[in-house]
Amino acid sequence: MKIGNREFDVTNRTYIMGILNVTPDSFSDGGKWNTMDHALKHAEAMIADGADILDVGGESTRPGHTPVSAEEEAARVVPVIEALRKHFDVPISVDTYKGSVADVAVQAGADLVNDVWGLKYDPEMAGVIAKHDAACCLMHNKANTEYNNFLIDMLAETQECVNIARKAGIKDERIILDPGVGFGKTYEMNLETMNHLELFQHLGFPVLLGTSRKSMIGLALDLPVDQRVEGAIATSVIGVMKGCAFVRVHDVKENKRAVLMTEAILGRNIK
């Protein structure tokens, strides 16, 4: 799979997506990187630590977050994306569910659109992605936790995202799927999702796993958000073993080492 100018071996490897939130209220790092200088320094550190992609977010998607306008979100992410493109040779993702933000972000240099609503929030989003021939990550999400059969329904609802993408003209080779741990799911459902990540492989697309610092880890370990690194590493290891092509993390160095060690144990060619 090609993202930006880089080829990703999504059938044999697991890559690190480093999180760069330029928001004042993200659940774990809001306000830390929302100045240009800090954002660039953090990006440089994540690349040095082994990040393969940087995911830039301008609006928190944590439960109870304060929504921002598309104009404000774009004003946060576009200058950062432009600066990243100027200073670093690394694929860039924009974390947004608004088509207008995705449009200007891709024009600014983003290679991938990471949509936490899987094209179901903004009817313009799929067309924007198709127009630019951008890569996209489509996450399973819903506004409640009501399912008839959780796993079957989750897979069917994720397939709906794929259908929207295809109808808009997005090519299959541009699509990544995210099971959406922490979104539209109870604690028990999140654990069940982790236990059955391999089911997402049957949909025929690379899978991205995003669990870093999330409440599932906090509930399992009874730890605050700033003490969940080890829990996130455990989920990343499971992700590698279940065939995920990407893991989206805050703590790049720790997760990168865990991923590489797991790949070595599994006999994957990492040299």
Language model: regions and residue ranges:
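Catalytic domains of carbohydrate-active enzymes, especially glycoside hydrolases
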Residues: 41-57
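Conserved Motif II region of HX4D acyltransferases
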Residues: 180
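Conserved hydrophobic/aromatic pocket- or pore-lining residues that grip, position, or stack substrates
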Residues: 20, 50, 113
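SAM-dependent methyltransferases
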Residues: 1-13
